[in-house]
Amino acid sequence: MTNTQVTLVQIDNYGPWTVTPEPRREVDLQTLQSRLYADLSQLIGNRMGYVFFTRFDNMVAVTNGLDADAHALIQESVGNRYPVTVSLSIGVDSSPAAALGTATDQLQDAGSAQDKGRTEILRGDPIQPSERTDTDVQIAHFDVNDATGKYTDQLNEFDSFINIEQGYAELMRYMRHENDSLSFFVGGDNIIAVCDGIDEAAYLDAIEHVNETVGVELKVGVGLDRTAQAAGMAAKHALETCREENTDVEFAR
Amino acid sequence: MTNTQVTLVQIDNYGPWTVTPEPRREVDLQTLQSRLYADLSQLIGNRMGYVFFTRFDNMVAVTNGLDADAHALIQESVGNRYPVTVSLSIGVDSSPAAALGTATDQLQDAGSAQDKGRTEILRGDPIQPSERTDTDVQIAHFDVNDATGKYTDQLNEFDSFINIEQGYAELMRYMRHENDSLSFFVGGDNIIAVCDGIDEAAYLDAIEHVNETVGVELKVGVGLDRTAQAAGMAAKHALETCREENTDVEFAR
Amino acid sequence: MTNTQVTLVQIDNYGPWTVTPEPRREVDLQTLQSRLYADLSQLIGNRMGYVFFTRFDNMVAVTNGLDADAHALIQESVGNRYPVTVSLSIGVDSSPAAALGTATDQLQDAGSAQDKGRTEILRGDPIQPSERTDTDVQIAHFDVNDATGKYTDQLNEFDSFINIEQGYAELMRYMRHENDSLSFFVGGDNIIAVCDGIDEAAYLDAIEHVNETVGVELKVGVGLDRTAQAAGMAAKHALETCREENTDVEFAR
Amino acid sequence: MTNTQVTLVQIDNYGPWTVTPEPRREVDLQTLQSRLYADLSQLIGNRMGYVFFTRFDNMVAVTNGLDADAHALIQESVGNRYPVTVSLSIGVDSSPAAALGTATDQLQDAGSAQDKGRTEILRGDPIQPSERTDTDVQIAHFDVNDATGKYTDQLNEFDSFINIEQGYAELMRYMRHENDSLSFFVGGDNIIAVCDGIDEAAYLDAIEHVNETVGVELKVGVGLDRTAQAAGMAAKHALETCREENTDVEFAR
């Protein structure tokens, strides 16, 4: 059974800040958001976690291996370098969706995302080191079959994007409802899902569902390990195996 | 009539690079992609353009006011600072979708996105300064009504995200097919669309369509100007008017 | 005669901020400072200016070609993305040192660098476009003869650094007092000086002085143009000529 | 007795790269260098180390607590995100200067800094965890007495800078030769020295020497701990004590 530690990262009171005293230049907001995400990728990633940009003002991270001190350091480092601060809330569950549910509840209990007085919240309990196992995190790395040949090199770029986006929108919803999994678009034709130790049949079912519903053909490599980084790298290698052997689902060995 | 100048930014041969010689660490790829986008936001944004992250390996920019030299400088600056290079292709049309179609065609003609020998392409003709007008770019800035109150402060963050994402997926498709417009999620509950000078009825129709189809309620501020930055800032102010006056569509005066 | 436009960039009330409420983590301060400098390099550099890190909390830029609006945009963009703000003060003079003197005076008149109420000052008048000429900026690019062979590949790195640093400390002082020029270490074994249209004899004299005083052998390429970027690139090519022809001073033709 | 672990970071074959095929735009080189330094500050800093920009193409880090894997990860992460690679060489000694000497020797033995074939070297042995103690690193944080009042708010900014720079050049040389210590300018009026467990008399002597030689008045806070970060933060607090109690040297208790 997996045991996923999820951290919800929320920029404090961000919406109001973006229009105070006047709406701020969009390109500066875009720069701020994407650089904050890049920094979190390094801060969390170099401790073997993964973070996903999600809505940028709310980001979701898989943080198995990061203790409370590591979270506090990340929060402090952001506060020292950005005009905004972040709140962090940690949830743990075999189901990634339930873990994020716990993390969200804790943050909502502390106050609204647009409450000026609710800043730099740090809630939740990381997994104890003694309870960690080598099968705590399952990561599935999907991509689209021959996306470059079928889309990028053929269609208007926006239509390529629509195809990828419809595939993603369908997969994210299906995986959430059928498998308690959290799926994130990570650029190109790639989607990374954090899963509750689901099996080959479940992956095949999701791939079929997306193909039947929106006509986008996916394949997936799956890895299982102690941290998001280790599981994710195993998933990438498994995806390479899919490519070489022309298969739809591969589990890392 | 609008006259949108669109630039397609494509990372050269990116897919193969990400797995050569072995799959690279995902967090480094995420950092690279989001910082490249941040840099383009500044490079293009400080010349009054807008750039959208789209798929990150393919980004779409509105570049009215940027001539060929400005494009060449951006291309050179990226080449000097990243392990990857970018190709740029410029299209101009009253229809943003058609402009991007031209830009895409030009780049596809130059070779595949995964052709090792096709690097740092720069194609297409910017608008001549003498032909530019104060109504060349129409920008529509949408957001979700009370997203914080209805979603962020209530739901599991992933379910908030699913709602925003379904709203976006529906809007992008509808605006593309009905209005030749290009719509981009820009974080939070915000979507920015580059439009072909469409009117209030067309915006109301799109908002109704999204509400009926996926139950997400949008409002929109619309600006028209010489550059994306000026039109976009006007749109933001118009969106503030929607908020204050509780209306669905506002055009900047 | 040159006509250098210099901008002093000063982080507002930075010293007190770094220790409020407690001393902030040094690595975050270093990250903040060097990224702010990197951003200014792009914001100013992509408008054909040069900026030097100097003391990081006070930076000096050569901004021929940047008008007041460009300065205001840079100031706004920093304010939107950093936890600190910057003041900018512009001076113009045939002497770079005198231009910086004017810029400094204007900022000192506005209040102390550690005055909480003195933020985002923007003072001084850029050169009128009609008064700009192709010989407004002289840039001299120095490097150390065979620094890799004599220092980097031979000495303890700190002793290499001491040599470079003593060479720089001597050159900066001499060029300031003898030639009203501003010299900046820019990394490696490179020093860039902004000069008042001085001639070959003055450069040879400075090189001799440094060699005699601290035993560091320099050579220099010199460029003259409308902007720092153009003059600086010409200087780099001239320095390549020094390397190829084994000469001490070369002026770009 | 201190036991400093020093890592020399050297950009591989950087000089030739900056002029190949033609000299690259200086502002892009400045951006690249300062961002690489910022990234290393985070990568090393968030593992409790310190890194100093030194010459930018050669940087010096204090890395007590970073093992070989952490070094390898940093090297890989840079290689994934920059157009250049870095070599890393680790030395350990009670004398910081000797530790850097070892690190430099190892890298020089591997080949020239401008040898195309010598890339991504990783040499040297970090301290074994069992051998680490709470007094391994001594950090001294100097600043200039009333630098804002005497220099920044009074003089031409370049003359302020000359004063700070002369103070630094004198201190770095003296501390290296008298105390085997490595001193680095870190911006503003701040100098951080990595020291070989020297005592109050040695600090007072250095301060007097700088004052007598170049007329710059320094004070210093000193911290001793297991890591650079912990020792450095203690030093900052001790420096605050100097400010409050108007003393020249304070050791953290």
From Swiss-Prot, chains A, B, C, D:
EC numbers, comma separated: 3.5.4.29
An example molecular function term from Gene Ontology annotations: GTP binding
InterPro entries in the record: GTP_CycHdrlase_3, Nucleotide_cyclase, Rev_trsase/Diguanyl_cyclase
Keywords carried by this UniProt record: GTP-binding, Hydrolase, Nucleotide-binding
Family per similarity comment: Belongs to the archaeal-type GTP cyclohydrolase family.
Function as written in the Swiss-Prot or TrEMBL entry: Catalyzes the formation of 2-amino-5-formylamino-6-ribofuranosylamino-4(3H)-pyrimidinone ribonucleotide monophosphate and inorganic phosphate from GTP. Also has an independent pyrophosphate phosphohydrolase activity.
Protein name: GTP cyclohydrolase III
